[in-house]
Amino acid sequence: MNLPRALVATATVALALSACGSGTDSGDGDTVQVTTSFYPLEYAIEEVGGEHVEVTNLTKTGAEPHDLELTPRQILEVSEADQLVYLKQFQPSVDDAAEEAGDAAFDVSSAARLDIAAEEHEHEGHDHEEGEGGDHAGHDHGSQDPHFWLDPTRYADVADAIAERLAEDDPDHAADYRANAKDFRSTLTGLDKELKTGLSDCRQTDLVTGHAAFAYFADRYGFHQESVSGLSPGAQPSPSAMADLIDHIKEEEITTVYAETLVPQDLAETLARDAGAEVAVLDPIEGITEESEGEDYLEVMRSNLAAVQKGQDCS
């Protein structure tokens, strides 16, 4: 990649100072060096690339991916990678790096079919205050929900696109990439069937979530999303919006408000307490932490299934 010389020079000096005597290995030269911007892309690359890729994830374990700011070391990692796989408008600092990376950057947005507006799944009249965390440090996802991986069928389409991109850069292993993507699609198809079956008959179809990350999940499995914080996890709903949502929860006899793992649960807990509901965890799987109900995407999705079955009173 060809990032600005000043940035790379700064990153090189910082990395040299921090790595003196560490014996850091930069790869064996026989694998495709792929940098991903957050966990679901890392997981897909690992599944599709297998032994032929070496993956570095820019969003570290336990970090909220929306908040990512690239360090000098990460800028250098991006500049040295064969590919940068990212989702445009999800992480502004990565967008900046991708612009400089040119042809080495691969945006999965088209393959993900980001065509559902999060607002269509928010509670009517649910506005949010500006201020600390209100605009989430200026992050702008546009009107579409970026969390495509919560619909396994869209995730499979992205995996296919990743396979084709890897095949283009590493034609010697093209057959392996395509075979791995086919296997991954089969796994995701099975997961989708589990979700369809498990969520086919639920008494409550209003899904009250921490932030509007579940538009694709809701659309795929027959729910209507009501978000506390909109698309940005740090946004603060106005008092009137909170009161409106509390009234809605009571009127519709909603029993569960879903919190997340990577952001504070205060708002969800307050909402649930004031509305007489319980709090459960519904993980948007933006990253895996010690608090995650599973060690990888598949396990956490199945934990989500169990949580929603209980919270939405599914039979």
Q: How would you name each of these model-derived features?
A:
Residues 2-11, 16-315:
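Extracytoplasmic metal-acquisition and chelation regions
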